Each structure stands twice: as C-alpha cells, then as structure tokens.
Amino acid sequence: MTVLDSILDGVRADVAAREAVLDFAAVKAAAAAAPPALDAAAALLEPGIGVIAEVKRASPSKGALADITDPAELAAAYQAGGARVISVLTEERRFQGSLADLDAVRRAVSIPILRKDFIVGPYQIHEARAHGADVVLLIVAALEQDALASLIDRTESLGMTALVEVHTEEEANRALEAGAKVIGVNARNLKTLEVDKNTFGEIAPGLPTEIIKIAESGVRGTADLLAYAGAGADAVLVGEGLVTSGDPRKAVADLVNAGAHPSCPKPSR
C-alpha cells in the first residue's frame, strides 16, 4: 500500500463518520446558504507571480512542522504579506488539520481560501463550500477519471475553482481531459513522498497557455520561486517554508516582492 492509499483509507473513514452526523442533504443546504465564493482564478492572474500561503501543522514526510495555535492569526499575517490565496489543510490524521481551521481562517481573511485535503467524493465539495472555501484541491492520482471530471464540474457549479494536482505527464493529460482550468504540478510524489523540483519544468511547458499553472512543493525561498517562474509558473504554493520561517508575514512578503520584481520571468499567455 502506498502512502497515498493509506491516507485515502483514513479520509474515507473520516468522511463517513462526518456524514453520519450531518447528512449530504444538510451539507448541500449549508453550502447553498454560504456567501458566494471569491474568484481565485482572477486573483492568481494578477500581475507578478502569486503566492498561495499554507496553514500547515504537519506532513507525512516530516511529521510535526509548527505549533499553530491560532490559524487565523497566521492567515492574517499571510494576507498582510501579500498572499493571493490562503491554503488550509483540513486532513486530520497526517496533517493535523481540521474544518475548524478553515472556519477560523475564513473569518480572518478577505482573500480566497483553498481547502487542501484528499477529496474522494461530492460530500467534501459541498462541505468545503459550506465552510467558506473558494478553491478545492482535486488530486488526479487519488481519483478515477469519471470521478475527477464529475468533481471538477461540481466544484465549478458551486462557484468555486478546482485546483487539479498532477505529478506526471499522464496525470496532466488526464487533468486536461477532465476539464481542468487550474493545474498544480506537485514536485512531491504522493505515493513515495520523494521530491523532484524538476517535475514542474518537465510538465508545465506541455500545458496549454490558457491553463493557470501552480508550482507545488520545494519552495524554500526566492530562488525557488524565480526558478519556477522561469519554467512558466503563474503562482507557487508554499507551506513548510513559511510555517518554519519564524516570521511568516516577512517570508511571504519576500516571495511576493521577488515575484513582482521586473527581473522575474513572466508567464506567457
């Protein structure tokens, strides 16, 4: 069993437990009653290389990363530093996240929020919207093709943006076939947890110009952002490098300033 398979087993059990308490009809009603989703795609296409800053307590590869007692305060610091989008981990077992974190961050910031989790079905899509998410992560390696296409459609039908994550060219092709408009290339292989920063540069050039391209994993500082920008990234998603920085607002601001500098490569579109 791969690391991804193990995570998905836990997620399915946790979703079933939540659905036993709050059924699908109730979650759909809560999603319908939520304020309209913010336009994350537009935010990511603003001038300069965007920064998606992540609230991340732990990871399967590193274990505990940061003692985040106040996710709202951290998210507010990210926004003050110039982040375009805030990513919030909601997976409980390996990442120590929660929907309560999503709620807290939603109350604290006025920019789009990404629910970062392992989505396995429509319940979680409506759940994300009900808790204020504007973007949902869909991982190609975790989904059959029909389910991927269906979940992209459902996400967009609720006014949200689907960030479709890939790690190989085959997965990128699947994402395009399913209708993805925003594609994240993860340098980390979720089946082995190994990181290869060259992955983005191998996959992104083959994506259509109109696709919004996000580089995920491996950003430790401005040099990494500039390298990803040179390979065609519209934005970078950064978690560990921010929560371990000691000054998250400054760490975000440094990345944002590098991405806005005239010498930074600009995406062609």
Curated annotation (Swiss-Prot):
Catalytic reaction(s) noted: 1-(2-carboxyphenylamino)-1-deoxy-D-ribulose 5-phosphate + H(+) = (1S,2R)-1-C-(indol-3-yl)glycerol 3-phosphate + CO2 + H2O
Pathway(s) annotated for this protein in UniProt: Amino-acid biosynthesis; L-tryptophan biosynthesis; L-tryptophan from chorismate: step 4/5
This enzyme's EC code(s): 4.1.1.48
Pfam family of the protein (one): IGPS
Molecular function GO labels: indole-3-glycerol-phosphate synthase activity; phosphoribosylanthranilate isomerase activity
GO terms, biological process: L-tryptophan biosynthetic process
Keywords on record: Amino-acid biosynthesis, Aromatic amino acid biosynthesis, Decarboxylase, Lyase, Tryptophan biosynthesis
CDD domains named among the record's database cross-references: IGPS
InterPro entries: Aldolase_TIM, Indole-3-glycerol_P_synth, Indole-3-glycerol_P_synth_dom, Indole-3-GlycerolPSynthase_CS, RibuloseP-bd_barrel
Coiled-coil intervals: none
Superkingdom per UniProt: Bacteria
Family: Belongs to the TrpC family.
Protein name, per record: Indole-3-glycerol phosphate synthase
